[in-house]
């Protein structure tokens, strides 16, 4: 359940001159594909929170050092002193099975992601329209950065199928990933547009073409 303060925050929208299209949805709902489609069609710059989270765990960052100290060799892909790389699958397995560990990791990654989004918005301020792909847009209170929010809607069965195929997860692990986010039904209430990605690609393509007039 969310309280009135959270509800008010979820209703916030960016009121500046730049049009900022927020794209969000459940895990494996098709956010990146849809963002890429808009970029190919309109050449609008894309700011991708997942990309910045990936950067946060790149070699030799301060965040990586903290992760190494906390979890040790079990999350290191290469044990060479000169080339220690985070095993993201091993790390994900830890945090999605333990809420405290998940909160700890998010607590050090999200400030970095926030900073990168701010930096990229500054670089893109001359563009009249930008796209922000943010998986945890509602959960982490990014609604005030967006002029409008497109929620990519697809059934849980499709999310599970994609997660198992894409990330080689068991059905239990795939369900854990989905359950770690807010329910789709809740997030849809606070979106401005619902993009249907439950059928073939033409369905959402037609929606976007109509919505953004191309």
Curated annotation (Swiss-Prot):
Residue ranges of domain DPCK in the record: 20-214
InterPro entries xrefs: Depp_CoAkinase, P-loop_NTPase
Catalytically driven reaction(s): 3'-dephospho-CoA + ATP = ADP + CoA + H(+)
MF annotations from Gene Ontology: ATP binding; dephospho-CoA kinase activity
Pathway(s): Cofactor biosynthesis; coenzyme A biosynthesis; CoA from (R)-pantothenate: step 5/5
Signal peptide (from-to): none
Record-listed ATP binding positions: 28-33
GO biological process: coenzyme A biosynthetic process
Cell membrane found in the keyword field: no
Intracellular or extracellular location(s): Cytoplasm
EC number(s) from the headed UniProt entry: 2.7.1.24
A Gene Ontology term for the protein's cellular component: cytoplasm
Pfam families: CoaE
Enzyme class, broadest EC rank: transferase
UniProt keywords, alphabetically: ATP-binding, Coenzyme A biosynthesis, Cytoplasm, Kinase, Nucleotide-binding, Transferase
HAMAP family from the UniProt entry: Dephospho_CoA_kinase
Family label: Belongs to the CoaE family.
Function: Catalyzes the phosphorylation of the 3'-hydroxyl group of dephosphocoenzyme A to form coenzyme A.
Protein name: Dephospho-CoA kinase
Protein source organism: Prochlorococcus marinus (strain NATL2A)
